[in-house]
């Protein structure tokens, strides 16, 4: 966050000029600043543990932090790579617990898997279509509109959060198979 706020992207997806010219974008993990927002994007690493199971600790910790500050009608978009169903089965209950709000009544969720492959200069955030989804059709439209403003080559709206989560897993599997052969 500190690096991005001084317009430095260690993944080299964005140059200084692009980051400095983005007027609506703010990077922060300060809870006072976060309380002012109505849309949150959670994108944290989701490594696998020694047993090759997803380690969701960072994701759930970030979700808990956001759960403590969300308000009615807020939107939380997840980007971390997870298994199909994780957002609604693992993250939503944490948001409900810490916010005391009800999912799809008081707050809403979206999922749009990150598509950045650090170091890949061919398939960058600027030229890879972004998959989007939402917890309700009207929420999916909002999530899609947010990313349409950012992703030049466009978006693809998935019919559900679970389908968008599965698309990311399929993409990773295909990449791994291509590398293996």
Where are these regions (language model features)?
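Structural/interface elements that position substrates and couple domains in central-metabolism enzymes
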Residues: 1-181
């Amino acid at each position: 966050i500190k690096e991005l706020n001084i317009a430095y992207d260690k993944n080299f997806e964005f140059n200084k000029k692009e980051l400095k010219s983005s007027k609506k974008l703010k990077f922060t993990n300060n809870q006072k600043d976060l309380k002012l927002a109505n849309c949150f994007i959670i994108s944290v690493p989701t490594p696998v543990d020694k047993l090759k199971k997803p380690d969701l600790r960072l994701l759930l910790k970030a979700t808990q932090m956001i759960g403590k500050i969300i308000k009615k009608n807020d939107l939380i978009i997840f980007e971390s790579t997870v298994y199909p169903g994780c957002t609604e089965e693992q993250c939503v209950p944490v948001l409900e617990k810490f916010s005391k709000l009800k999912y799809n009544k008081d707050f809403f969720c979206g999922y749009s898997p990150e598509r950045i492959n650090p170091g890949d200069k061919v398939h960058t955030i600027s030229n890879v279509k972004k998959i989007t989804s939402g917890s309700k059709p009207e929420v999916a439209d909002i999530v899609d509109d947010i990313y349409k403003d950012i992703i030049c080559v466009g978006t693809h709206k998935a019919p559900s959060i679970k389908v968008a989560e599965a698309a990311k897993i399929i993409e990773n599997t295909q990449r791994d198979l291509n590398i293996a052969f």
